Amino acid sequence: MMDSLRTAANSLVLKIIFGIIIVSFILTGVSGYLIGGGNNYAAKVNDQEISRGQFENAFNSERNRMQQQLGDQYSELAANEGYMKTLRQQVLNRLIDEALLDQYARELKLGISDEQVKQAIFATPAFQVDGKFDNSRYNGILNQMGMTADQYAQALRNQLTTQQLINGVAGTDFMLKGETDELAALVAQQRVVREATIDVNALAAKQPVTEQEIASYYEQNKNNFMTPEQFRVSYIKLDAATMQQPVSDADIQSYYDQHQDQFTQPQRTRYSIIQTKTEDEAKAVLDELNKGGDFAALAKEKSADIISARNGGDMGWLEDATIPDELKNAGLKEKGQLSGVIKSSVGFLIVRLDDIQPAKVKSLDEVRDDIAAKVKHEKALDAYYALQQKVSDAASNDTESLAGAEQAAGVKATQTGWFSKDNLPEELNFKPVADAIFNGGLVGENGAPGINSDIITVDGDRAFVLRISEHKPEAVKPLADVQEQVKALVQHNKAEQQAKVDAEKLLVDLKAGKGAEAMQAAGLKFGEPKTLSRSGRDPISQAAFALPLPAKDKPSYGMATDMQGNVVLLALDEVKQGSMPEDQKKAMVQGITQNNAQIVFEALMSNLRKEAKIKIGDALEQQ
């Protein structure tokens, strides 16, 4: 590697820092460059292996991301074996695509400079506080991992190179100015139309309907006249929030005594370092310090640790678990105390102890309110779980009624009115409860009451036990109950057909120049002109922009059906060429070029996959 990367590789701070950053790269598969393939690979892409470790890390990261995003809904997806299998395949496909892109980037000899790698490190959000690089946060996080600087720098370089390839592909599409102006004029075009509406509802009222037509329509469309499955439910609800228990001073003191670790802030230590490549350089720096030299100034001038040097050698506050062994073993006890020259894996160090914050246990008064809330909640949960078990046992022992469960709970069961899947009572509107009601397991035969449910828990602190007291299966409504509804539908259908036939005849006359007489005879006339834009998504706008351009002093005619189902005759009088502000034109071009770039990129990936030798590991093929 070039000198600046070797400098990074020999930085104590970077030795600490590089390990943790790779966690973020696992999300995009970059860790594949760091984990050895071995024979037990997840996939082999040409000669590059994607290890099982890389695949499992990527899959777990994606799963964790989804869990954070979806919350409680994720558990339902996780229980779906087919969905999780598909998710695993998607993650593997992504890793394969990234390997193909990496190989193609190397084939094109794309590269990233050392300075770009360094700037990417400084810009990593994980190491920033309030948008700025923070040395203390940097050290605290990165001492927890064991990845070398060389490994991380190469992984980051590979990721940036792949992104360079993607950006190159995405930036190849463009539009000429003439094309842009022509397209903008077309997109911004407006059309001036007049409308004449045939009111289908008015026609429907005039349509004669026979009993035979009503019966025939009913028979052919019975599924449209269903009464949904209906239920009446009796239930008992248990809620930990209603079971608050008193909390005594003794309870609070006991919790405080038993959980001291929760109220203890561990000791923190602050060090500054100067790192050199050779022992002679370190001795020279130590000599200057002993003569009164300014530590911060010397660190900025002479330290090889590129991160701490920017802060005058300051490494920020460190807890014991994050302090490197070199600093622990320096034996510094007093503030301002300097070490001698320390040999380390990254060169030579001079360390100064800047400050110590001793471990501190918060007083009982400081945490009393928090403890009281915790103890109260724990007592409520204990009472809730005890009552839940008692009610569950009672409901199981007497499955023919909720009487025993009522006695155990100390409350009477609540009885709902009739409801269906579409209007579940709000009090019962939880997925586990709905599943129990609607899965059929609690329904008795021929509408009779069924058995009691098991205890159904919701959100960990609420529970229900219920039984279906009455049930009505889904059924077709009798014709007598829906006759008027069926008649209206038949009339409306006949009116729609008549309106379209009438409109077609009028359209022929309009195009033949006989429209005035025909429209007058039909009791119709065109309304005032209105201007429509191409962006309109309604049926009238869509039909207007599908019409041929009008001739001079002669409208272009057409017909459409509006949002209410009425048939509308259209007269297109004028086409106005549009204009577009430059910012809108720029946004339009950007959208088109991005879409085209996506198409090109997908074609590239398809071709890379087609030409590659891809083998899925045996273990994954069997899953």
Curated annotation (Swiss-Prot):
In the UniProt entry, what is the domain comment? Consists of an N-terminal helix that anchors PpiD in the inner membrane, followed by three domains that face the periplasm. The first or the third domain are probably chaperone domains. The second domain is a parvulin-like domain, which is devoid of catalytic activity. It shows a parvulin fold and resembles most closely the inactive first parvulin domain of SurA, which is part of the chaperone unit of this protein and presumably involved in substrate recognition.
Effect of inactivating the gene: Deletion of the gene retards the release of a translocating outer membrane protein into the periplasm. Null mutation leads to the induction of the periplasmic stress response. Null mutants are hypersensitive to hydrophobic antibiotics such as novobiocin and to detergents such as SDS, and exhibit altered outer membrane proteins profile. In contrast, another study shows that inactivation of the gene has no discernible effect on the levels of outer membrane proteins. Lack of the gene confers increased temperature-sensitivity in a degP mutant.
What is the recorded function of this protein according to its Swiss-Prot or TrEMBL entry? Answer: Chaperone that functions as a gatekeeper on the periplasmic side of the SecYEG translocon. Facilitates the translocation of precursor proteins across SecYEG by interacting with the translocating substrate. Also plays a role in the release of newly synthesized secreted proteins at the periplasmic exit site of the Sec translocon. May be involved in the early periplasmic folding of many newly translocated proteins. Acts as a transient subunit of the Sec translocon that binds to the lateral gate of SecY and is detached by nascent membrane proteins but not by SecA. Does not have peptidyl-prolyl isomerase (PPIase) activity. PPIase activity could not be generated by substitutions at the peptide binding site of the isolated parvulin-like domain.
What is the first-listed, main subcellular location in coarse terms? membrane
Q: Indicate the segments forming the PpiC domain, all copies.
A: 266-355
One annotated GO molecular function is:
identical protein binding
Q: Which residues lie on this side of the membrane: Periplasmic?
A: 37-623
Q: Which UniProt keywords apply?
A: Cell inner membrane, Cell membrane, Chaperone, Membrane, Stress response, Transmembrane, Transmembrane helix
Matches recorded under Gene3D superfamilies: 3.10.50.40, Porin chaperone SurA, peptide-binding domain
* Topology within the bilayer: Single-pass type II membrane protein
Q: What is the effect of changing residue 313 to A/R?
A: Cannot complement a surA null mutant or reduce the htrA-lacZ activity induced by periplasmic stresses
Kindly indicate whether the keyword Mitochondrion belongs to this entry. Answer: no
> Consequence of mutating residue 350 to A?
Can complement the growth defect of surA skp double deletion mutant. Has originally been reported to eliminate PPIase activity and to result in the loss of its reported surA complementing function
Organism of origin is Escherichia coli (strain K12)
One Pfam family here? Rotamase_2
Q: What is this protein called?
A: Periplasmic chaperone PpiD
Q: Which InterPro entries match?
A: PPIase_dom_sf (IPR046357), PPIase_PpiC (IPR000297), PPIase_PpiC_CS (IPR023058), PpiD_chaperone (IPR052029), Trigger_fact/SurA_dom_sf (IPR027304)
Q: PROSITE patterns given for it?
A: PPIC_PPIASE_1, PPIC_PPIASE_2
Q: Which SUPFAM superfamilies match?
A: FKBP-like (SSF54534), Triger factor/SurA peptide-binding domain-like (SSF109998)
Known outcome of mutating residue 312 to A/R: Cannot complement a surA null mutant or reduce the htrA-lacZ activity induced by periplasmic stresses
Q: Which biological process annotations from GO are given for this protein?
A: chaperone-mediated protein folding
Q: Where are the transmembrane segments?
A: 16-36
Family in the record: Belongs to the PpiD chaperone family.
Which GO cellular component terms are attached? plasma membrane
